[in-house]
Amino acid sequence: MSKKNSIWVGILHMGLGTVLAQMINIVVQPILTRIFPTETLGIYTYLISLATMIIPVASLKLDMLIVSEPNEKEAQYITDACIIINILISLIYAIVIIVGYQVSDNNIFNKYGIIIYVVPVLVFTNGLRFLFISYLNRYKEYKTISIIAIIREAIRAVIQVGAGFLSLGVFSLSMGYAVSPLFGLNIQMRN
């Protein structure tokens, strides 16, 4: 396949995968607003916002180097370093949350109780997600990236909607966001 055609195939795979994944999200959001109380959705959004402040830098953006590193061995070292850094950042954030939760009764970490402890898990699993997207991007595995995005959103939707019908609350909403990237990792490991 020519380089020009492979670029278009990559664009098609990434574009279609992104659109389908977002369509799942667009369809599920109104369902979630009907089956979860407003307060539960608000707490969930709060937890996600605390996680998304850290997720983009969970590996200190070193995952970007994986794509461009010409040496395979060096790329593997970078990947390993990113995993370790992601673990460390998640643990540091967990410590900050634990200390913040214990120090005062009136701060952002103890506003909604112990549910705050799910945030470092969100950081860790989604940090891994971005790391392995970079790894797949290195090998131009755009179709796999798209399939993983679709499956991740579908699994998140099933977990969250199922939790809503079972009245499981904000923890289950958060777990949908935390667990769904792991299914993508499972697919990637098989490739």
Residue ranges and their predicted role:
Residues 9-14, 47-51, 84-85, 113-118, ...:
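Short alpha-helical transmembrane interface motifs in multi-pass membrane proteins
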Residues 5-60, 94-101, 122, 152-157, ...:
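Signature of the first transmembrane helix
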Residues 55-74, 137-138:
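Helix-loop junctions and terminal segments of transmembrane helices
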Residues 27, 61, 65, 127-132, ...:
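Transmembrane alpha-helix boundary/hinge residues in polytopic small-molecule transporters
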Residues 3, 63-66, 131-138, 142, ...:
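C-terminal transmembrane helix end/exit motif
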Residues 53-54, 95, 99, 108-136, ...:
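Alpha-helical transmembrane segments of multi-pass membrane proteins
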Residues 7, 34-45, 69-81, 91-124, ...:
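Membrane-interface helix-capping segments at transmembrane helix termini in multi-pass transporters
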Residues 113, 117-120, 147-191:
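Hydrophobic alpha-helical transmembrane segments
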